[in-house]
Amino acid sequence: MTTTGALGGRWRATITEWGGIEPWRDEPALQWHVAADDRWHSPENEAAVRQTRPGGAPVTETRVRIPNGDAVQRVYSVPDHGGLTVIEVENESPLPIAVAFTHGRLLSARPGSAAIEGIVLPEGSVVFPVGHHSTLTVALSHDGRGAGVLPTNLPTATGVARGWTAMSDRASRLVLPDESIADRVVAERCELALAGPVHPDDDAVSFLLGVAQLVRMGEQPEPWLPDAAAAAEHAARAGANDWALPLALQAADSVFVAAGDRRASRDLAAVRRRVANVATVLPESAPTDPARYLTWVEARLAVPVDGGAALLPAGLPPSWTGANFEVYGLPTGGANSVSFAVRWHGERPAVLWEQTGEPLLLSAPEVAPAWKSADSKGEALWPAPAGVAPVVDGFAADAGDGGSFS
């Protein structure tokens, strides 16, 4: 499931695995059906349906197999004209098709037809012809205006995806051997931006982690300050056994620093002293909660420690041995961050780093125990990983949907 909507607007919907659009407020869902040369194809009931989110952005591409090709649906939202969800259906086959939608409250270049044969659909459904190797574009208005003429010069799916990726990269950018990890990072950040963090009463730790991600992506910190302060107190009281508690309090401090609220930072310092004995022990498995997942990934690359930050604190994933990678803007406390790249020289990794903000003492206890540096930028040659031969291709071929640090 994918959340869609335009930032700055309140309209939201869920895109199902088969490309249906289910608004969160009291509006009818929009399903789609394809009439090909052989029969009607209903994506919800078809076995040969494949959906992807290129790069992790909330731009879905759903493919339905039809004779001699695919019907390819793309769904994405834009803020233009009061907010629109754009639906494209591309006919990749050499024969014409028709596409039916289960209600007619759509913007289109030409009106759809209500004459639908061969399939039973809800009253008010409409159908549009799509020529061979051509694309139909319609849109759903977020203001509920109903049917009308489709505006011209709307942003493209590719352009919208680029915008979401750029927003995610403001928080941190990861260029990893396992691309699925970076894609999921983008996806989870987009989900946070559209759906917001969990309620602090439900999970104060996740709330703080999520708010910090949003602020790092460009949201203003001030509206979050009262809830963040209360959530930090609640998390400290209730989360003593939570692996992410120290990172959540660190995240809260970054929000206060971004807002220039020194008093909140001082108050938080007292809270952090009360739980100073709580250690950050990263779980082996990736969390499912978006904010916790993002924190887990970043903390496996760089994590704040007393007086500094540790790079690759869980060690170098064996499947990354021999593969170059680089990461940018990982938080190390307050307004500080670190970027670093690993380049291989034979069996030995070389690290190049640059710190933003006040330089901290960097270390890599699991990868290079003897290495430490408080320089703002530099490079060093780390020892060869013990007992691990370089991987020629750089990473495992199949790491699954969530990526792999193994």
Language-model regions, residue ranges each:
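Catalytic cores of carbohydrate-active enzymes
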Residues: 260-289, 307
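Terminal accessory carbohydrate-recognition/targeting modules of carbohydrate-active enzymes
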Residues: 1-184, 282-406
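Short, well-ordered alpha-helical packing segments
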Residues: 86, 102-104, 229-232, 249, ...
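Substrate-binding groove/exosite segments of carbohydrate-active enzymes
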Residues: 165-271
